[in-house]
Regions:
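Thioredoxin-like thiol-disulfide oxidoreductase module
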Residues: 77-80, 84-151, 159, 164, ...
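Sec/Tat signal peptide C-region and signal peptidase I cleavage site
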Residues: 19-25
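Short active-site neighborhood of thiol/selenol oxidoreductases, capturing the structured segment around
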Residues: 50-64, 89
């Protein structure tokens, strides 16, 4: 009887190892490509010596549209250039379990049902946990609102749809205009027919 329990236990261990490796490979795939991704902690630390805005891609391992962004949008040369030259680009797993200490507050993972969420993700997204979601922080770690009343930019975006938002923040246009007015004057590096503001 004891031997049969051990035999049942071995396949469970093997499955756990396979899924753990798959999850690790998936995380490493998020960090591959032309964008120089870093952790939230690394971006905050780097900001202490060289001030720069922070772009945060809030994702989860189960989010299909997050994977499409990783495959189609972030590898785009124009998107990667804007991110690398103007921001500290951060990948933040909204379900990561490690604590993060930021400005004297410890943000923790909150188990909920079969999954859970990280308190930092909830704070960044104003408790609107949908993925993918994108947050911009200024050089003093304040959230830069893209739309009036919204702290984040939710949803999948193609490169030509995403570029105006990145250039809006990178060029500090958010300090003097709203995104709707900016898009009317925005000059796209993509074809005019597929870009908001150039139709």
């Amino acid at each position: 009887m004891r031997f049969s329990k051990q035999l049942l236990f071995l396949p469970c261990v093997a499955l756990f190892i396979v899924f753990s490796r798959e999850g690790k490979a998936q995380t490493e795939n998020h960090l591959a490509g032309p964008v120089k991704w870093m952790t939230f902690e690394e971006a905050v630390e780097k900001s202490k010596t060289e001030k720069r805005k922070i772009f945060i891609d809030v994702y989860t391992g189960w989010c299909g549209w997050c994977k499409v962004m990783d495959k189609n949008t972030f590898p785009d040369p124009e998107i990667a250039r804007l991110l690398n030259e103007n921001f500290y680009p951060v990948k933040f797993d909204a379900e990561q379990e490690a604590d993060i200490v930021f400005r004297g507050t410890t943000f923790k993972f909150i188990p909920q049902g079969g999954r859970g969420y990280h308190q930092l993700a909830a704070a960044l997204l104003n408790n609107q946990l949908s993925y993918p979601n994108f947050v911009f922080l200024d050089e003093e770690f304040r959230i830069i609102p893209i739309y009036q009343g919204y702290s984040s930019l939710p949803g999948y975006k193609k490169p030509e749809e995403f570029h105006p938002f990145l250039s809006f923040v990178a060029g500090n246009f958010y300090q003097k205009a709203n995104i709707q007015d900016y898009q009317k004057e925005y000059k796209s590096p993509y074809s005019a027919s597929s870009t908001p503001g150039n139709n």
